[in-house]
Amino acid sequence: RDRSPSRGLGDVYKRQAHEEVIALSEKLNAPVVYTFKGKMEVQYENPYEVGMTGLLGMPSGYYSMHEAEVLLMLGTDFPYSAFLPDDIKIAQIDIKPERLGRRAKVDIGLCGDVRMTIQALLRMLDPKTDDTFLLKQLKRYEGVKKDLAAYTENKGDIKKIHPEYVMSEIDKLASDDAIFTVDTGMTCVWGARYLQATGKRHMLGSFNHGSMANALPQAIGAALAYPDRQVVALCGDGGLSMTLGDLETVVQYKLPIKIIVFNNRSLGMVKLEMEVDGLPDWQTNMLNPDFAQVAEAMGMTGFNVSNPEEVLTTLLNAFELDGPVLVNIMTDPNALAMPPKIELGQMVGFAQSMYKLLINGRSQEVIDTINSNYKHIREVF
């Protein structure tokens, strides 16, 4: 049958199991799916990877798991139960026994080190020659990557710069061993989808708690711990507003952190969650200070970017300058992030939200949302 094992991975790197994961995938002809937390440790030099799964994931990752007959979960306490298949066999390997079966209906749970357990499995498994399922998922993944790349081609408009384009440029400019810190919210979405692993890069976020305003303090810690590595803080305007005092700390300790602000003038993820539930957004718009001027007042270099044509040159300048730099980029407040699988209830809720905006005299917001996300809307319908 056109089905096969699929494998979901979390924080495998800490168990130094990258080579073993590749070897197991090769032996089984199985696609590899990873979580956001595991992306930097799993994606690179991996011919079997088919993208990320979870709330911020991709359709290819989602369907690889749901179309498989067996799912092997390695080192992941996957929190998004709604994205896990419930009608296939699931095996889970984790060094912490309390995680086994906590989220998923597990048929086989093994407590142990991922690397050592895979090594033992490799000696016991016969090679699988049928690669039909793997090739099907890889083909789907190629289509997903083309769609993601297409969203970066349109740079946006004045004060409505497309965040996908910004993050793709950051990915190209950042060093191969950069440490990224991502604020919880929409910034996480763009980082998850457009920052690519190299085997040396690392990404920090509030992955377990999902708390706001984590990027800047994490960047400070990373810069102090690894003074020879490039540290890039990817902040939302909401998150940065909560940690403005940390800019003084960055200057005080002369930390060469590059702070990129995705300033959409709103609590974007909260706004999206309200819209999906059929509610017009309320109290999600932000009245922000001029973050570049705040940075200058604190003693660091600050840039404002409102024109999409100035994004690349400003980022180049920021990365080349010594010392801390803040780049405040005015991104599109209506940019949406689609989950890997859109449920009917989400579509209905979003439509209800747009209707309520219309009847409350906010028709321009509806028009702006459609104009900003026509490619996403085309995919859905």
Q: Language-model segments: which ranges?
A:
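Glycine-rich, acidic loop regions that bind phosphate or pyrophosphate groups
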Residues: 38-139, 319
